[in-house]
């Protein structure tokens, strides 16, 4: 062990013990254990013996092993902080930006994901994928297809395979022309699933794509309903009553679907609260 690091480690241990002692009496909801708290950045570096890259790897591993199936909005908020910290410690961390793109925006943490992806885009000048996911989030979550297409075109010079470059430029052109549509989101998520090495993570992404396909079915039926009835939907069950769907599609995550103020079907990202 490096003796010169001993005082740093002792201070880190003292800070950690103090933080745990203060936090144990603070009331908080029951949460998934992997994402209960985000430590200050200087504490993370101190606990890693002053090595910011080791601290980034520890934070990235923490995000990787988190059990997303049982996490609540507060957990995802903490995961967003953890992954932002990893990006600050090592903006070129590959696993961190990939996990951020695949999980955070789909669970209400779009800004956290964009922060991670923006830093990865600047640090990984050889890698087009952080720019692609950043552009996709602008398109799908922020619903700003023009800005998304402009970002996507920045990825094109980094692509080494000519056919892939053409494909990216074609997507950018479609975003400029068409705007928001769920089927584009399905294609991106399925592409990420095909690249995923972990089988559990692959299934998670495939389920996410299945959920988006169901949303597309609802939106197409809602458009036909509005064309026939000359008014927007007031309730999703009207699609069944009008004979446009035999039954409403089920959300594989169990959260369900709803209508926005314009009568457009949307995804719910948390269980609906039943009135007491």
Where are these regions (language model features)?
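Inward-facing hydrophobic residues that define packing positions of alpha-helical scaffold repeats
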Residues: 79, 83, 100, 117, ...
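Short coil/turn linking the two alpha-helices of tandem helical-hairpin repeats
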Residues: 64, 68-72, 101-109, 128, ...
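N-terminal alpha-helical interaction modules that lie
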Residues: 1-94, 106-108, 272-275
């Amino acid at each position: 062990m490096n003796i010169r690091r001993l005082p740093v480690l002792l201070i880190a241990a003292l800070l950690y013990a103090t933080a745990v002692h203060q936090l144990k009496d603070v009331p908080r909801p029951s949460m998934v254990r992997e994402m209960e708290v985000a430590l200050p950045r200087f504490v993370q570096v101190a606990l890693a013996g002053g090595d910011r890259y080791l601290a980034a790897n520890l934070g990235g591993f923490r995000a990787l092993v988190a059990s997303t199936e049982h996490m609540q909005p507060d957990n995802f908020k903490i995961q967003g902080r953890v992954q932002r910290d990893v990006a600050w410690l090592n903006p070129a961390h590959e696993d961190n930006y990939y996990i951020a793109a695949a999980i955070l925006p789909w669970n209400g943490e779009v800004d956290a994901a964009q922060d991670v992806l923006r830093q990865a885009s600047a640090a990984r000048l050889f890698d087009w994928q952080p720019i692609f996911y950043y552009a996709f989030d602008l398109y799908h979550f922020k619903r700003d297809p023009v800005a998304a297409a402009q970002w996507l075109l920045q990825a094109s010079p980094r692509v080494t395979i000519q056919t892939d470059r053409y494909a990216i430029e074609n997507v950018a052109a479609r975003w400029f022309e068409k705007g928001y549509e769920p089927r584009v989101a399905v294609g991106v998520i399925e592409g990420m699933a095909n690249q995923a090495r972990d089988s559990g993570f692959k299934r998670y992404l495939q389920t996410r794509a299945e959920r988006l396909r169901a949303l597309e079915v609802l939106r197409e039926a809602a458009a036909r309903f509005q064309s026939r009835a000359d008014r927007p939907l007031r309730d999703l069950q009207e699609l069944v009553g009008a004979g446009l769907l035999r039954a409403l599609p089920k959300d594989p995550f169990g959260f369900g679907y709803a209508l926005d103020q314009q009568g457009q079907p949307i995804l719910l990202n948390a269980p609906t609260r039943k009135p007491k």
